[in-house]
């Protein structure tokens, strides 16, 4: 009898928190929160990358995109899942620095090459970080909506 009382009490106390978690997830999806919902154009661009790029190409992309790309493509990213990226805080800071680059474009391209970056994904997430001076120096490879995939030219 005491067991049943404890079981019912535990269920009664845990049910509201479970409902809150489910409701907040559904609310985020309904609002189109970019942390949970992938834009159709970004999804198409990701599919194109998976279909056309050579395995293990290094891509510079924003934090959310960098978290998703390796899950759907064979590409590698500068900064991906924070718990699976060694020195994640340093790489995220580098990513923000690169997308906010306002110095000489040639120095930015050199930095990308030194890091081994072959492609840059530049879409709404990356645009919100910055408008790097080196973007016009890249070669456009593919475009879907506002999303663009650029190749870092060889010197």
Could you tell me what each predicted segment is?
Residues 3-155:
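Extracytoplasmic
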């Amino acid at each position: 009898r005491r067991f049943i009382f404890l079981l019912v009490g535990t269920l009664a106390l845990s049910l509201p928190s479970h409902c809150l978690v489910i409701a907040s997830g559904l609310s985020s999806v309904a609002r189109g929160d970019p942390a949970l919902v992938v834009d159709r154009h970004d999804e198409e661009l990701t599919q194109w990358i998976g279909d056309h790029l050579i395995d293990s190409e290094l891509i510079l992309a924003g934090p959310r995109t960098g978290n998703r790309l390796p899950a759907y493509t064979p590409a590698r990213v500068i900064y991906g899942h924070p718990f699976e990226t060694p020195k994640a805080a340093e790489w995220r800071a580098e990513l923000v620095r690169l997308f906010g680059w306002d110095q000489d474009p040639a120095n930015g391209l050199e930095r990308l090459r030194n890091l081994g970056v072959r492609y840059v994904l530049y879409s709404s997430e990356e645009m919100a970080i910055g408008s790097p001076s080196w973007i016009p120096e890249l070669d456009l490879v593919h475009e879907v909506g506002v999303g663009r995939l650029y190749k870092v030219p060889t010197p």
